[in-house]
Structure formats: structure tokens, C-alpha cells
């Protein structure tokens, strides 16, 4: 439990209250705290859900046994959201040599800071922070902090929710507890997620009580490639929502679009512009999505209930900023104004697969997008993404499940995947080996990036410093081709949503030699694959494998073979068109007299491979990997067999390339040395 997590963002006055703990709190500490040698001698979290308010009480103590922990405890910060509740501090004490030093009684008060800790992530939440500068701490002290916070979310209209990770071993706690309670008559439901035993449960004085002793047992390890529902850490979710339909219905009042676009307003003008440009619904949707992505900056305003309450579309467009809710509502209003069937949906961008096993609460989600239904197909439109265009609008994000926001309520629906129509990256390479098997290979790489992958290159495309551009190209290509880049340019086609990187460079040591044969191992999207999910443990044998994606990579390589290479052979699998381990592989290779053409692609979307099919998947990938193409040249002309004139002629393009590096930065000694070596 980090020092700075003494109270979760809480929450309705702007002044810290110094009062006794709530009457319902049952203290856990029973002596021996000052003598404890655990780093966290005490951790007591108690939560009460009642009358639409969630109260969170925390009593925590730290043993300061090192200079590092002493420094960390020098300032204690308690944060809260004043639009939703209060922060109360009940105790701030130092236990030293059998004495109790009451810092609050001694007049210690915090500095109240209003700062946006997430501003670099474009997030404004109105958090206030009470920063206590603790005086006179010494090694061996025990610092004890007791506080509570209240949370009443205006968007939930009296409904309540609570979710928290459960502290597990190997975290060491001397005495630890997590206790939750609510009136027996309250319609509260709860669920534990992850590998954790059920809590003790009983009814007491008209309240239902759940109690965990902390830390709970360390969860059994899970394979990293398992679906997300298997990898959830221990946590508890509690809420007053009866089911997902209840969650959907409760949110729907905030996402109606009727009357949100003024008939003669700015948004109506944009709608008219799009309708005039095309009468094809999908093209209209793509244009509206582009407008929301490109012309409205992302900014989360969590103040005044903004974590769930959306900004009005007219305000979003006027300010040109908004979060996922604001962008989604703006996009939704525009689509409906154009007669396109659409609705807002809640998703979890971090672990969507776990939503299906979650307790129905709004907190199971962290993101909102729009689901449009056009010509029988669902399109999942994310206004916070970037670079989406008609060619990529059909790509399905990896969210797993979605909750439609409807006035009548709705259940979870799957975010069903489909194969993308356009590659995220198209790599075209001219690979010039004509100088010989001992010479560096000259190459020109022409790469197109689409969608969000392309949008990431916008900054580089705007750069004027050629040295920085070449550096960016070098960094990207070092794991694709390697070697040295000596010239590059980066552009971004805003209309197409495509970034283009064109680079010239040279690669080294592209051949291996054995008994007079030079071998070059062809690289591409379909080469160097492996598939080795570990299911050796008996507890893992029924756990499926989860693929990544969606991601589609296509490559086109054109080789200029070494001069006077009469005996060139191609081994390996020259054609592929199959689905293996959840990945589509395509390959076509053609060896000519002076050239070698290699075209291939891979595509995978999020899916699960049942444990029973993993053996077949391993064998399929092993077979594909064993057929990685290899070019073999028998009796190639070696460098020492060439005369000086031929060597000079063949090396001149390489020297010219090195000279371009010197032109970029003439005082770089390494560039001069490189050219000198050539």
C-alpha cells in the first residue's frame, strides 16, 4: 500500500474536517502497534454504502525503518473531489518510544493544493489535495494516519457502487482488514473477481457485513497469454444496480440527442456539409468521425459530475475539446441527424474481456464509443482515436464487450471481430544486393501507416530538422531492416489518414557462408514466427490462448540479386494462404534471373484459441517457421576476387550515402569514420 494512497480520490466540501471517525466504524487495532516490525503494521479499510453515499474509512500505519521510508513519509497527501464529498482526518500521530505524538492536537494543518495531477494526460478532475508536512520524523517511528471520505456521485441519482483491489501476499501487513457494510434492506449485490476466497459474511444490527482479513493469499499465477478474465487480480465489486439493463437505463438520461443540435447552429452546418458531400451513409459516418477525432481535442473534465455526465454537443464543438463521453455524444447527435442508426456504448479499454464476469456497475467500464449500424454491419466508432478514414472504419477495437446505453435498458453485447480490409502498415522495400555478397546492401524503404498507426507520425511529418527525421527513421527501421539510414522523409496525407516514411539506407552482413554457398535468410511479415503458449501446469491445461490485435502487416520486397549470380536457389515455402494460431498468413515468392520478388502479409484479430487446439496451432506455426525462405548462391564472386576498379564502382553508391550523413551533421566524427571505412 503506497504512502500516497491513504484515501482514494474522495469527495463535498473544500475544507478538511477534523472530527471523530463515523459511529459505525469498528476499530481494528488492539495493541502492539508501536512494537510491530512489519512495514505496514496496520491497514484497516472499512466501507459503508447507505442512502446513496459511499463512505470509505482508512486507518493505516507505517513503520519507518529506513531513510527511504522516512523521506517518503515526509509529506502525506490526501486527495478528494469536493464536488462529490468531504475529506475528514481523524488521526495523525507519531508513535515513538512508548509515547504518542498527536500532530493534529499540536496544530499541524495541511496545505490545500488544487492541481491537476493528470493534466499531461489531458485530464482535469478538480481534485483537491491536503498535503501534510510531517515534522521531526525519526528512523524507528511509526506514523499512523486515519481518515475517511464520502462519495455521492450526482450522476448515479442515489445508486451506489464501490470497487477495490484486495491486498494480497506477498505484501506484508501486521494487522489488516477490508470490511464492507450496508443496510440489510438495501438492494446491494456484490462479487469478487480474481483468485480470492469468499469473505466472511454476516448480518449485524440491521446491516450486512463482508469482511476480508488482509493480506489474502497470493493468487496462483496465470499464463500471460490467457484471456483477460483469467488474469484479473483479487478485487471486490459492490453496487445497487440489479443488472446490466439497470446500469444502461440509469445512464441513458444523459445521452439523449434530441434537441442537442440547434437547427441553424454550427453543428447543423457541419451536418449539412457532410450530407452535401455524399449520400452514402458509411461515407457520411466516416466524415463525421474524422471531424470529431481531428477537430475536437481530447480533454477529460471530471469536475461537477463530469466523470459520468457528458458535455453538451454544442459546447464541445464551440470549445473544440471534450472527453470520450463528449466526443461520443457529439458524434451520436450528428449521425442521428443524418438518419444513421447509432447508439452510445460503454466499454473497458483496459480489460474488456473481464466485463462479462463483473458485477453490473458503471465502474466496470472506463470508456465510451459509438456503435453505428449501417447496411447490416456494426461499426465501432471511437471519437478519441485518431486517423480513422473510410478505408479503416471497419476495424473493430479490442474491447470484448459493450453495454449499449438505452432508455429501456440493455444487456452486454459482444464486440464481434472481423478481418480488416486494409493493412495497418504496408512496407515496400527495394533491396539492392547487386554490389556483391560481401558488400553492404543498399535499400529504399517506402512505408505507409494507416489509421491510428499513421496518426502517430503526424508530429514527425511536421518536422523541418532533417537530422531528427533521419533519426526517427533509423529508430523505427532498426528492428525492421537494421543498418544505417542516410536519407529520409516523412509525410502525412490528412485526407487519406496515411503517413508515409521513405528512407534510404544500407544493411550489413546479409549473407552467411558455408562451403562456397552464400545464404540470405529472407525476412518479411510471415517469417521468424513462433507460437509457444505454456500450459504445462495442470491448472493451466484448460485455459485458452488470447491473440492480440487487430493488426495487419503487408510487405513487398524486390531484391536486386548480386551481379553474375548464375546459380541462385530459393528454398522454403514460397506460397502461403492459411489461418494458423489465429493469424492469417499469405505469401508469394518469385525468383527471376536478376531479381527476387517477395510478397507476404499477416493479419490477426483478438480471438481465443481453445486449449484443446493449441497443439495443432503449435504444429502449424512450426511448419510455417521451418519453411522460412532462404536465398542460396553457389560460388558467388567474393570481394577479394574483384579488381580495384570493380570494387570502387560497386562501392560508390555506398560512399555517396555516407556522404549524405556528413552533410546532415558534418561535425559527427562517426560519420566521417564510416565513410572512410567504405
Locate the predicted segments by residue.
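Bacterial N-terminal signal peptides
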Residues: 1-8
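A sensor for short, sequence-defined functional sites
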Residues: 12-664, 670-674
Amino acid at each position: 500500500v503506497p504512502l500516497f494512497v491513504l484515501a482514494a480520490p474522495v469527495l463535498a466540501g473544500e475544507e478538511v474536517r477534523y472530527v471523530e471517525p463515523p459511529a459505525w466504524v469498528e476499530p481494528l487495532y488492539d495493541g502492539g502497534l508501536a512494537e510491530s516490525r512489519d512495514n505496514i503494521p496496520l491497514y484497516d479499510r472499512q466501507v459503508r454504502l447507505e442512502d446513496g453515499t459511499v463512505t470509505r474509512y482508512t486507518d493505516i500505519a507505517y513503520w519507518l525503518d529506513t531513510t527511504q521510508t522516512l523521506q517518503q513519509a515526509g509529506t502525506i497527501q490526501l486527495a478528494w473531489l469536493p464536488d462529490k464529498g468531504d475529506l475528514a482526518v481523524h488521526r495523525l500521530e507519531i508513535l515513538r518510544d512508548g509515547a504518542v505524538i498527536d500532530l493534529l492536537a499540536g496544530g499541524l494543518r495541511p496545505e490545500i493544493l488544487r492541481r491537476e495531477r493528470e493534466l499531461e494526460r489531458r485530464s482535469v478532475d478538480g481534485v483537491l489535495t491536503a498535503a501534510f508536512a510531517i515534522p521531526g520524523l525519526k528512523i524507528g517511528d511509526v506514523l499512523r494516519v486515519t481518515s475517511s471520505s464520502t462519495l455521492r456521485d450526482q450522476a448515479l441519482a442515489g445508486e451506489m457502487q464501490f470497487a477495490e483491489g484486495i491486498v494480497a501476499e506477498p505484501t506484508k501487513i501486521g494487522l489488516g482488514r477490508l470490511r464492507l457494510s450496508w443496510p440489510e434492506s438495501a438492494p446491494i449485490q456484490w462479487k469478487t473477481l480474481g483468485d480470492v476466497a469468499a469473505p466472511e459474511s454476516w448480518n449485524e444490527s440491521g446491516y450486512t457485513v463482508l469482511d476480508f482479513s488482509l493480506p489474502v493469499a497470493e493468487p496462483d499465477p496465470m499464463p500471460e497469454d490467457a484471456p483477460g478474465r483469467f488474469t484479473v487480480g483479487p478485487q471486490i465489486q459492490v453496487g445497487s444496480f440489479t443488472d446490466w439493463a439497470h446500469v444502461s437505463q440509469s445512464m441513458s438520461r444523459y445521452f439523449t440527442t434530441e434537441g442537442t443540435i440547434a437547427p441553424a447552429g454550427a453543428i447543423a452546418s457541419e451536418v449539412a456539409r457532410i450530407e452535401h458531400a455524399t449520400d452514402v451513409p458509411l461515407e457520411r459516418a466516416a466524415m463525421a468521425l474524422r471531424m470529431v477525432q481531428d477537430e475536437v481535442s481530447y480533454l477529460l473534465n471530471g469536475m461537477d459530475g463530469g466523470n459520468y455526465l457528458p458535455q453538451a454537443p454544442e459546447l464541445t464543438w464551440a470549445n473544440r475539446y471534450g472527453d470520450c463521453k463528449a466526443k461520443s455524444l457529439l458524434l451520436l447527435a450528428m449521425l442521428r441527424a443524418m438518419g444513421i442508426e447509432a447508439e452510445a456504448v460503454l466499454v473497458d479499454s483496459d480489460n474488456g474481456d473481464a466485463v462479462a464476469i463483473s458485477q453490473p456497475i458503471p465502474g466496470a467500464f472506463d470508456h465510451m464509443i459509438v456503435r453505428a449500424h449501417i447496411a447490416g454491419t456494426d461499426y465501432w466508432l471511437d471519437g478519441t482515436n485518431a486517423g480513422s478514414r473510410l478505408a479503416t472504419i471497419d476495424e473493430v477495437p479490442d474491447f470484448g464487450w459493450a453495454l449499449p446505453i438505452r432508455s429501456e435498458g440493455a444487456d452486454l453485447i459482444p464486440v464481434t471481430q472481423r478481418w480488416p480490409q486494409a493493412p495497418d502498415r504496408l512496407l515496400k522495400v527495394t533491396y539492392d544486393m547487386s554490389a556483391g555478397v560481401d558488400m553492404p546492401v543498399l535499400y529504399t524503404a517506402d512505408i505507409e501507416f494507416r489509421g491510428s498507426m499513421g496518426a502517430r507520425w503526424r508530429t514527425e511529418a511536421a518536422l523541418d530538422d532533417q537530422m531528427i527525421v533521419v533519426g526517427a527513421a533509423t529508430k523505427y527501421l532498426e528492428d525492421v531492416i537494421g543498418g544505417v539510414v542516410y536519407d529520409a522523409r516523412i509525410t502525412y496525407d490528412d485526407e487519406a489518414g496515411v503517413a508515409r516514411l521513405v528512407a534510404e539506407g544500407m544493411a550489413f552482413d546479409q549473407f552467411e557462408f558455408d562451403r562456397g554457398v552464400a545464404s540470405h535468410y529472407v525476412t518479411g511479415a510471415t517469417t521468424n514466427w513462433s507460437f509457444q503458449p505454456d500450459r504445462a501446469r495442470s491448472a493451466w491445461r484448460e485455459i485458452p490462448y488470447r491473440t492480440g490485435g487487430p493488426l495487419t502487416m503487408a510487405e513487398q520486397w524486390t531484391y536486386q540479386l548480386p551481379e553474375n549470380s548464375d546459380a541462385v536457389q530459393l528454398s522454403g515455402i514460397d506460397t502461403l494462404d492459411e489461418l494458423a494460431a489465429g493469424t492469417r498468413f499469405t505469401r508469394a515468392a518469385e525468383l527471376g534471373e536478376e531479381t527476387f520478388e517477395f510478397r507476404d502479409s499477416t493479419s490477426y484479430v483478438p480471438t481465443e484459441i481453445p486449449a484443446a487446439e493449441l497443439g495443432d496451432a503449435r504444429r502449424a506455426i512450426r511448419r510455417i517457421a521451418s519453411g522460412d525462405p532462404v536465398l542460396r548462391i553457389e560460388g558467388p564472386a567474393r570481394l577479394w576476387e574483384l579488381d580495384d576498379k570493380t570494387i570502387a564502382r560497386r562501392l560508390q553508391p555506398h560512399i555517396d550515402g555516407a556522404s549524405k550523413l556528413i552533410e546532415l551533421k558534418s561535425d559527427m566524427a562517426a560519420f566521417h569514420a564510416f565513410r572512410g571505412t567504405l
